[in-house]
């Protein structure tokens, strides 16, 4: 199910883990890799079509993955940005079934302003957070591990005890680790197929695909 605003979301019950990140962090690609559904989030040249809250039931309707609108909203009017940001804030603040975040950051540009805001907000709400440094295939192993260590050190300075890993949806780096995290929170395995209507899913922006 997809909803443009909090008031139209599925019933606020059960347990939800939301995927959040900038519009170019590879969020849709990560969800596709995790659920083994190549067309779950489809590419579009119209960024506005992805700015909805998308719910995916994992067999049990009370356990859901949630695909949140990417923040950053490049190349869209300012008034549209404000509307999207307001609805995203409403979900993050008021959604009682939201229990955790998977926060995606491009490994080449980690800990941007909005990322820091999301981390601080999640901490204030006592949510668990698992961070994916996406597009790790863009760096060699040494530089990628260096960024991972630097981000871990920054989180430690902020006194944020959040888990973090390298991830690439292109070569499936870190996929099993991510699935293990999901299994610890939801009844999820890589072989499990989520229940959803593909045709009901709004198309994703080009910026949300792996570059």
Curated annotation (Swiss-Prot):
Keywords: Cell cycle, Cell division, GTP-binding, Magnesium, Metal-binding, Nucleotide-binding, Septation. GTP binds at residues 21-28, 48-52, 67-70, 134-137, 167-169. GO terms for molecular function: GTP binding; metal ion binding. GO terms for biological process: division septum assembly. It holds the Pfam family MMR_HSR1. SUPFAM superfamilies: P-loop containing nucleoside triphosphate hydrolases. Mg(2+) binds at residues 28, 50. CDD domains: YihA_EngB (cd01876). InterPro entries: G_ENGB_dom (IPR030393), GTP-bd (IPR006073), GTP-bd_ribosome_bio_YsxC (IPR019987), P-loop_NTPase (IPR027417). GO terms for cellular component: cytosol. Residues 13-188 form the EngB-type G domain. Its cofactor is Mg(2+). Necessary for normal cell division and for the maintenance of normal septation. PANTHER family: ENGB-TYPE G DOMAIN-CONTAINING PROTEIN, MSS1/TRME-RELATED GTP-BINDING PROTEIN. Belongs to the TRAFAC class TrmE-Era-EngA-EngB-Septin-like GTPase superfamily. EngB GTPase family. This is Probable GTP-binding protein EngB. It comes from Acinetobacter baumannii (strain ATCC 17978 / DSM 105126 / CIP 53.77 / LMG 1025 / NCDC KC755 / 5377). The lineage of its organism: Bacteria, Pseudomonadati, Pseudomonadota, Gammaproteobacteria, Moraxellales. The gene is engB.
């Amino acid at each position: 199910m997809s909803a443009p605003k909090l008031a139209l979301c599925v019933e606020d019950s059960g347990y939800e883990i939301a995927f959040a990140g900038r519009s170019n962090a590879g969020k849709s690609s990560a969800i596709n890799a995790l659920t083994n559904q190549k067309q779950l989030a489809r590419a579009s040249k119209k960024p506005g079509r992805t700015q909805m809250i998308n719910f995916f039931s994992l067999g049990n309707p009370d356990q859901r993955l949630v695909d949140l609108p990417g923040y950053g909203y490049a190349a869209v009017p300012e008034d549209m940005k404000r509307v999207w940001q307001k609805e995203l804030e409403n979900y993050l603040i008021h959604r009682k079934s939201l229990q955790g975040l998977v926060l995606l950051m491009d490994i080449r540009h980690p800990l941007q302003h909005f990322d820091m805001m999301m981390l601080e907000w999640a901490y204030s709400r006592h949510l668990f957070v698992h961070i994916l440094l996406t597009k790790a295939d863009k760096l060699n192993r040494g530089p990628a591990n260096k960024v991972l260590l630097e981000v871990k050190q920054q989180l430690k300075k902020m006194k944020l005890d959040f888990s973090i890993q390298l991830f690439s949806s292109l070569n499936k780096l870190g996929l099993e680790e991510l699935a293990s995290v999901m299994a610890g929170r939801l009844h999820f395995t890589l072989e499990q197929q989520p229940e959803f209507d593909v045709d009901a899913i709004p198309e994703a922006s080009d910026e949300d695909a792996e570059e």
